[in-house]
């Protein structure tokens, strides 16, 4: 089958002819319709320090997708040939304390599709049936293909009550922008997103941010005055992984504020712990999606009118995957979709 793989420990992704994955008793086989390129895939393409420590080479990569079930293992119940599905990219052990308590997103033994085992940049993907999520008929293939990153945004944004709250989002990447859309949709008052990328800040405005702030050109404190804010932000969503952005967020938070952190710093960072202690801030780390409550919330948000369409900015056939990676690496894109249909 046709697939995109990391073949060598160097920059790049390559189109290969790969064996079709074998189906286990508890697995489903998915014929991929559309894939999306994740920031993780860009890290793997660039072969940065994280990738070098994490990715076994060769490896078929990718974990954002939608497709159709074409084969079902003999022990699988609840799915049928022809079902349209996406899937949870973290495959959990099922026997650790968190798994047995229903907190599978905190599994200490999780492995990643397209990271530790063959992924979805391929004509066919095999995953445990447990990991599959059936897509409602009134949700498009394109939106279903980005459920994985959308789930990160939903998990982060819905960590705290947002109704009537002032929200600060650090980082206008695709996940940060989708989080802004979620916050506005569920009733936040002001949703302010910060970055230094003018293209993505403009896209964040289209996604519903009250104010998109280029922190290289204007002060966050001035924006707060402009919005009539006198006590700081109630909710912070850290999506950037940038130490300077997190420090600025701590300063801008109201006493008793709550912060959800999804962004991963590239190296250890220092902060003023006095900001946390004396303000009584609550900080929550976010990893992946809650299985499968986040997935149900994603569907419900879209079905209730949440518009994510502006986030998809580029579409290419899978044979043009290099153009897709070039767009993602340029920073001048939202989500990039790769189509697997016949030309």
UniProtKB/Swiss-Prot annotation:
Residues where NAD(+) binds: 175, 195, 200, 262-264, 286-287
Keyword field contains Glycoprotein: no
Cofactor info, note text: Binds 2 Zn(2+) ions per subunit.
Any one GO molecular-function label of the UniProt entry: zinc ion binding
Reaction(s) catalysed (UniProt annotation): L-threonine + NAD(+) = (2S)-2-amino-3-oxobutanoate + NADH + H(+)
Pathway annotation: Amino-acid degradation; L-threonine degradation via oxydo-reductase pathway; glycine from L-threonine: step 1/2
Pfam families with a match to the protein in the record: ADH_N (PF08240), ADH_zinc_N (PF00107)
Binding site for Zn(2+) 2: 93, 96, 99, 107
Any one Gene Ontology cellular component term annotated for this protein: cytoplasm
Cofactor: Zn(2+)
Active site: 40, 43
Site location (Important for catalytic activity for the proton relay mechanism but does not participate directly in the coordination of zinc atom): 148
Record-listed Zn(2+) 1 binding positions: 38, 63-64
UniProt-listed Enzyme Commission number(s): 1.1.1.103
Record's keyword annotation contains Transport: no
Primary location: cytoplasm
Summary of subunit composition and partner proteins: Homotetramer.
Family the entry assigns: Belongs to the zinc-containing alcohol dehydrogenase family.
NCBIfam families assigned to the protein according to its UniProt record, in alphabetical order: PRK05396.1, tdh
Functional description taken from the UniProt entry: Catalyzes the NAD(+)-dependent oxidation of L-threonine to 2-amino-3-ketobutyrate.
Protein name: L-threonine 3-dehydrogenase
Gene name, Swiss-Prot/TrEMBL: tdh
